[in-house]
Amino acid sequence: MKTAKRRIDVNLEELDRVLDGARQAPLSEEDHDKLKGALHALVAMLARSPNNEKTSAVLGKPEGSSTSGEKQPAANAARKPGHGRNGAEAFEGAKKVPIAHPNLRHGERCPDCGKGNVYGQKEPKVLVRIVGQAPLAATVYSLERLRCGACGQVFTAQEPEGVGPEKYDETAGAMIAQLKYGSGVPFYRLEKLESQLGIPLPAATQWEIVEEAAEVIKPACEELIRQAAQGEVMHNDDTSMRVLQMEREPGDDRTGVFTSGIVSTRDGGRIALYFTGRQHAGENLGEVLKQRAATLPVPIQMCDALSRNVPKLKAGVEILLANCMAHGRRQFVDVAENFPEQCRYVLEMLGEVYGHDAEAREKRMTPDRRLQFHQEHSSPVMTKLHDWLEAQIAERKTEPNSGLGKAIKYLLNHWRPLTLFLRVAGAPLDNNIVERALKRAVLHRKNALFYRTLHGAQVGDLFMSLIHTCQLCGANSFEYLTELQRHARELAASPAEWMPWNYRQTLDRAGVG
């Protein structure tokens, strides 16, 4: 078990006083301890891995436990998906080249024994060969020109079939958008890469290409927002963003800029939306819900407990609010080093609930069956945990203003929305799906640092929404963006037929796929 470190209370004013005093005279023993403790705490926070919050990683194994008593996997247990080499069927985007035998045909006499006939096998021998290539390639066509010596008429060779009139075709815009807004590669970095590969592609040119493409495929994003508004469960959250040139509306005293993420689930599918500006996640969700059909049942909203994530809805419009269990759990993870025994109890109790939810997911339970399952198995656990939390405060076992006390009060204050999954079918446990979606915006912020203008941010939101929705529904985002540009007229006429989950069927009906 990890031992709790000595606690040193310090604030920024004290640190400023210590640093100012160090200019005049050597540090006292007390000031030295404060400064050293603050630096050690900062280093510990920076070094702490945010990717592993499992109870065993946070607190270690409990005393007296041993690996000998742990459940060992069966020798014949099925291996989890994702392990081992990729088979040929995994290369869905690869070019398929069938190769016939040069000398034999199905049903011909065997050249080896001369007695039997050869028949095609069900499974051919498969070879996979992977080659490298530039993200954007170029072809230079040299069209021969002939000039008459008498009349001066010039005759130019015809360009090859399939060469379009535009210098940058639809695939160029799709690839730049995929790299920039899907993979976090800034324009300047792609410019350097292409330059090294002998393909000049200035950052300004890249922006012009994606800006033009965004205008063409805008109807698809607008339809995506409309369909997201009809969702059964809506997750939302936001993260900070930076926009260099952003005009402020008269009377607007907000200084922050945010990228809001919304993930809407509907009929088992998921839609991801991004909105960048001064509005918070709740306000952006409210704008989306304005397009919701009045005949639909009340949706579930999943978010953390911040008030800015809850939309202000007009009279007659309702939502069922659910709060994120992972945020409540993280309150105890953050103070586990100082309160190991109490935090272990809470984390293990919540672990049981997550275990039940994982079992329901593995068994592919319907929302109603999942609700019944949680009521049978998770409700007693949560009731026991609630009684324990109340006893910690009521019986003064925990100081209310301590880190543990604040974590306990967080759960108690938001207990009803935290436990919506025990009362409403389909209510999720946490908001992790939108946290993962926001990583795309965080990746852009980390690599590109900022958007230059709000218009640039809106272009980024459009592409991120389409690309991440493709990822959620298993579609090829590069192919999808390409086809939207190629069929811009059809997209404008009927955008509902050009969603990431149905555009292939639309192409097949048109005889293009």
PLM feature spans:
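Acidic/histidine-rich catalytic cores and adjacent linkers
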Residues: C303-R308, K312, E348-G513
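RNase H-like nuclease fold core
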Residues: S68, E194-I199, I209-K312, E318
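Conserved beta-strand -> loop -> alpha-helix junction used to position metal-binding or nucleic-acid-contacting
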Residues: V233-M234, I300, A305, G316-E348
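Short, amphipathic alpha-helical "recognition" segments used to contact nucleic acids or chromatin
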Residues: A172-S183
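Short helix/loop capping segments that flank catalytic or ligand/cofactor-binding pockets
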Residues: G120-K122, T156-E159, V243-Q245, I271, ...
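Mobile genetic element proteins and their domesticated derivatives, centered on retroelements
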Residues: L46-S49, C110, C148, I176, ...
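Short, charged amphipathic recognition helices of the HTH superfamily
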Residues: G184-L193
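Short, flexible loop/hinge motifs at secondary-structure junctions
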Residues: M1-E166, H235-N236
